[in-house]
Amino acid sequence: MVLGWLPLLVMVLAPGTTGVKDCVFCELTDSTSCPGTSMRCGDDEDCFTGHGVAPGVGPIINKGCVHATSCGHEEPINYMGVTYSLTTNCCTGHMCNGAPDPTRGRLAGAAASLALGVLLLLQHVL
């Protein structure tokens, strides 16, 4: 009986498996922070963070969705009159290009511990 709960538990604890992917979006900026907003990506798109560099000036970044075929590419881009070399670094997963959330790992661990405790309790009751 306990094994019947396992698939349900996996579905509840596995976020981002619905096929819908949101990514963080922010315009090109020379700021070190890019909190951005959420945007919905297409089926053939991945989240990305673009890092741009140019001699004698600070770096630029942008974030959003991009076709998977554009991942890892480097291209020239003009920002504030300066030509930067912008590299697109992609990731897969819901909001994976956002800033790391230090509480996310602790919350997932607490949820997994609680679920395991419930399963063990059910095993002894049944």
Swiss-Prot record:
Residues 98-126 form a propeptide. Disulfide bonds join 23-47, 26-34, 41-65, 71-90, 91-96. A lipid is attached at residue 97 (GPI-anchor amidated asparagine). Residues 23-97 form the UPAR/Ly6 domain. GO terms for biological process: binding of sperm to zona pellucida; cell adhesion; sperm-egg recognition. One of its GO terms (cellular component) is side of membrane. It holds the Pfam family UPAR_LY6. Belongs to the SPACA4/bouncer family. This is Sperm acrosome membrane-associated protein 4. It comes from Bos taurus (Bovine).
